Structure formats: C-alpha cells, structure tokens
C-alpha cells in the first residue's frame, strides 16, 4: 500500500472527508505481540486487498455513503503516545458525525477508539471475538499489552458493555 492508496480505490473516486460517512483509519501498531510478527502490515494488506472487492454486496452500495481513507497513524512513539494519537484521531471523526473504521495492527489498537467512543456516547457496547479473553492485568510488565486490552476497556463498567466470545 502506498500513502495515497485508499479503500476500494478500484471501485470509486477518492471521496472528501466531508462527503464520506465512513472514515478508514489505518493503524499499523505492533508493539506487544507475543507469538508472531506482522500485525503492523494488517492495515496496508486490508486496503490493498480491498481493490479486489466489488462495491455492491448484493443488498447495498456502501460507497454511496462515501468512504474516506486517512493517512496511517504514525506508531513509532511509545505506547501511551500512540494510543493518545489514535484516540484523538478517532474522536475527531466522531466529532464530524462520521463513523470511524479502525484497521489494526494488534489487539491493543482497540483500546483507543473505544475510549474515544466512551467519551462521545453515554454507553458503548463492545463485542469481542478472539481466541483469548484478553483480560489479563498485565503481560510482560505492560498493562497495555494485547493480552490486557479488554480488561482496560472493561474497567469503567458504568459506560461499557462487554460481550466476549472465544
């Protein structure tokens, strides 16, 4: 993927931020993986493979609502800085009345957009599909590990409903 490639480029013209309901935010984050590497390549691979998709899914044309692809988040900083940047960018998408679509990286990526949603909405529901619950308090000395992300999300039970399937 190049910096100027966008989601479903093969099926549409580039949409403006203002005219797009859906905002793709690529987050090539890979800091706490414990088994294999490669999660940082996920967003680029998804965007590149989207060129093989058809815009019509048999029911609707999501492109009619507009899809805007942001430049990938710079994930070279420390965990706290990167997550703050992801949360800030997600919050700005919510503030525009748009729907963020976050393409990650490892599971830790989920934390920041969920925090942005919790600040924007009264109650947030999270449906978590994974082979693991990701509810550890910490892993390898990090409370922001991919294995801890759902625990961090669920700590504020007043505003988060978490359903997990693993």
Enumerate the predicted regions with their spans.
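Conserved alpha-helical scaffold segments that buttress catalytic/binding sites
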Residues: 2-164
């Amino acid at each position: 993927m190049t910096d100027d490639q966008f989601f479903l480029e093969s099926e549409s013209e580039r949409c403006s931020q203002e005219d797009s309901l859906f905002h793709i935010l690529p987050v090539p984050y890979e800091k706490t993986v414990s088994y294999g590497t490669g999660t940082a390549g996920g967003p680029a691979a998804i965007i590149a493979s989207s060129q093989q998709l058809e815009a019509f899914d048999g029911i609707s044309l999501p492109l009619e609502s507009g899809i805007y692809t942001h430049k990938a988040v710079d994930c070279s900083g420390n965990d706290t800085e990167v997550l703050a940047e992801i949360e800030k960018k997600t919050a700005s998408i919510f503030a525009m009345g748009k729907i963020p679509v976050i393409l990650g990286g490892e599971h830790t990526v989920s934390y920041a957009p969920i925090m942005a949603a919790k600040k924007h909405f009264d109650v947030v529901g999270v449906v978590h599909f994974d082979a693991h619950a990701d509810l550890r308090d910490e892993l390898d000395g990090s409370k922001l590990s991919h294995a801890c992300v759902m625990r961090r999300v669920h700590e504020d039970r007043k505003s988060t409903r978490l359903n997990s399937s693993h």
